[in-house]
A protein has these predicted regions:
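Broad gene-expression machinery/nucleic-acid interaction feature
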Residues: 4, 15, 69, 130-132
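Short, charged, surface-exposed hinge/linker loops at domain edges
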Residues: 1-4, 39-109, 113-115, 122
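DNA-contacting interfaces and partner/effector-binding or oligomerization modules
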Residues: 1-48
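DNA major-groove recognition helix of helix-turn-helix/homeodomain DNA-binding modules
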Residues: 120-136
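Ser/Thr-centric signal marking residues that sit
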Residues: 28, 32, 92, 121
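Residues at or immediately flanking beta-strands
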Residues: 17, 57, 132-134
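Hydrophobic/basic alpha-helical segments enriched in Actinobacteria
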Residues: 23-24, 53-57, 128
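Short, charged recognition helix plus adjacent turn
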Residues: 137-141
Length: 141
């Protein structure tokens, strides 16, 4: 899945407010459009990490329809994909612990989008769930 979400940037007298229709709890602002864009990515991954923490599915992004897309980082996307794969497989974190031969703390770190993890460890975890990681690079705006 591609974790790029349409954002609404609304200019207001005191700055720019950013909201995400697909992730309503992700809201931020900045004094300038540039600052709002920087904060938007942080607000998005913070809100999505709560979905992981609460064991809820990650919302699917809707079509951009002329709105600017805000993406999570490649590492964050891989962690969100792992979370989605765990939910789709209907397994618990403890089952993944046994399959990977890791301790619970290590698996929790692998799942946490706000923690750094080696990409190889994430690829191994996804392979255990019948998934593989592909990376694509696209032109920037």
């Amino acid at each position: 899945m591609h974790y790029a979400y349409p954002a609404v940037f609304r200019e207001e007298p005191d700055g720019v407010t950013v909201t995400f229709p697909d992730v309503p709890e992700a809201v931020t602002c900045g004094a300038t459009l540039a600052e709002a864009r920087t904060r938007a990515a942080d607000a998005l991954i913070s809100a999505l990490s709560v979905h992981v923490e609460d064991n809820r599915p990650i919302p699917k992004p809707s079509a951009a329809r002329g709105r600017e897309l805000v993406s999570v980082t490649a590492l964050e996307a891989t962690k969100l994909a792992l979370h989605d794969a765990i939910l789709a497989a209907g397994i618990t974190e403890q089952v993944l612990v046994r399959r990977l031969g890791l301790d619970e703390k290590a698996v929790r770190r692998l799942r946490d989008p706000l923690q750094l993890s080696p990409i190889g460890s994430l690829e191994s975890a996804l392979r255990c769930l019948g998934k593989r990681v592909e990376v694509s690079v696209v032109d920037g705006a």
